[in-house]
Amino acid sequence: MAFLKKSLFLVLFLGLVSLSICEEEKRENEMEQEDDEQSEMKRGLWSKIKDAAKTAGKAALGFVNEMVGEQ
């Protein structure tokens, strides 16, 4: 009977360790996925800022050209 108890405790312990390792890997994967999503959002934001700056630069250049042309 004692052998059966020890075997059962060993199986339960190994199962808990395995479950703990799986949960840790799952958390790491979720964190990596969140980081990837944040990187994509930042990339999208920077492209919008770049486009806005390009448009503003073209408008300013056009205005300067008009002012120079009037003189």
UniProtKB/Swiss-Prot annotation:
Residues 1-22 form the signal peptide. It holds the Pfam family FSAP_sig_propep. Keywords: Amidation, Amphibian defense peptide, Antibiotic, Antimicrobial, Cleavage on pair of basic residues, Fungicide, Immunity, Innate immunity, Membrane, Secreted, Signal, Target cell membrane, Target membrane. The modification Valine amide is found at V68. Expressed by the skin glands. One of its GO terms (cellular component) is membrane. Its main location: secreted. GO terms for biological process: defense response to bacterium; defense response to fungus; innate immune response; killing of cells of another organism. It is found in: Secreted; Target cell membrane. Residues 23-43, 69-71 form a propeptide. Changing D51K: Important increase in antimicrobial activity (both on bacteria and biofilms), increase of anti-proliferative effects against cancer cells, small increase in hemolysis, and increase in helicity. It comes from the Eukaryota. Antimicrobial peptide with activity against fungi, Gram-positive and Gram-negative bacteria. Is active against S.aureus (MIC=16 uM), MRSA (MIC=32 uM), E.faecalis (MIC=16 uM), E.coli (MIC=8 uM), P.aeruginosa (MIC=16 uM), K.pneumoniae (MIC=8 uM), and C.albicans (MIC=64 uM). Also inhibits biofilm formation. Acts by disrupting cell membranes. Also exhibits anti-proliferative effect against various human cancer cells. Shows weak hemolytic activity towards horse erythrocytes. Belongs to the frog skin active peptide (FSAP) family. Dermaseptin subfamily. This is Dermaseptin-PT9. It comes from Phyllomedusa tarsius.
